[in-house]
Amino acid sequence: MHPFNKSLLPKKVILSGADCFHLVLDKHAQKHGAGGNVMRKLFYFNKPLSAETIEAILKRSPVIYWLCNIRLREGLLFQKPCWEFIDKGNEIIVRQHQCAAENEVPREILGRDISIRSERFIEADLVHYPSGACAFIVSWNHILLDAKGTTLLFEHLNAVSENKEQDHALLFPGPEKKTNIITYIRNMYKVKHFVQQSAKPPVYSVGEKKKKSEEGLTAEKIIAFSSEETKIIIANARKAGSRFGPTLYLIACCSQIIDRLRRLKKRSGDLWIPVPYDGRLKGANGPLISNTVSFLFYRIPAQELTSVPATVKYLGAQMMEQIKLGIPQRYTMFLNMMRHVPLWLYYFLVSKTGKGVFASYLYTSTGDNFNNLRSLFGEPIRDISMIPALTFPPGLTFVFLKHDDQLSVNIAYSPDSV
């Protein structure tokens, strides 16, 4: 007997435009031997947790149950792809591991893929360390959840553990507004022109090889800052001219590093970085399921990389211009239109635009989404980390995460690139 009414779960959820873009990234990963489009969130605790208790809480979640009982129905021409709820009775399983190295993630977990053909689209692991501490790890296919969606997921799980009532309407995407074909076509030409100009060659990418030499291998590195160091970083961002939070400053710092790598390899080309932009309305608490991100596109020539403040200023001008032109909203409309295109043609068009170059490197940030998440399942969280999906090429992703007023940089990379 389930503690929720299964009849309330949606029988069908149409993929958003951003979801379909992640389908393209799945195809990109398969082509280049880069592993899957899997995200992992790690929660560290100072004491051992009970796998049975965690599993019992997860089994009370309608969202977790839905994620364990869906299949992808790919759209044909003029049909949108969707998730179908097929209710096979699958329930989530919490796997347990013993790890000799403190805070490390077993390769067994990192090597598991969650493909679009998997039985379950979310997995859970509990890793025990010699000190008595543990890590709870959730892995999911990125097609289903974006950064804000994962925040909402863990808030939802806390509500489940506390037996709080929840609004099911906030868990899944609601009905879409219809857009007429003329509006789609006009918008498509504007977006196509903008992106082609923004991404035109020459663009330098850290991923120069066509295929990874060791199939599926992803390396990880986490750089953690104390709360005092985080305050200094935020103060430095303001001094450098990053007016709307530290994002532009952090992108500028990453870009400086990549430009040094470019010069070290004696390569030419500008940097081109598509940066996720949350498409939810400000203060919105849903939907949990589905990607609602759009993008801002930054191109940085070498002459604008002479200093961090110079790069911040150049990025700021591009950001303001794109927001003024409504590029994030236009790109969302473009992605929504592309859902009607068969996947093979979609991939061909996307890869042709940048001549196979998806980006110089990839950057994303969870902002303050996890900063105030201090407990999970009623237990205090010591630290939160994240292992992003690796898109190859470029084969280098920076994820900035803030928890308990402490910033960390979570880096996923291919040894073939870096």
Where are these regions (language model features)?
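Charged, glycine/proline-rich intrinsically disordered loops and linkers
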Residues: 179-209, 335-349, 354
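Flexible, P/S/T/G-rich "lid" or insertion loops adjacent to the active sites of thioester-utilizing
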Residues: 185-242
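Acidic/histidine-rich catalytic neighborhood
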Residues: 273-302
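Non-catalytic regulatory/linker segments of enzymes
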Residues: 6-7, 45, 221-223, 228-232, ...
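Helical lid/core segments from catalytic subdomains that handle acyl or acyl-like groups
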Residues: 58, 220, 291-369, 374
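Non-catalytic N-terminal regions of enzymes
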Residues: 1-185, 234-236, 240, 245-271, ...
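A short small-residue
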Residues: 37-39, 228-236, 294-298
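Short proline/glycine-enriched turn/loop segments at secondary-structure junctions
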Residues: 263-264, 284, 350-354, 387-388
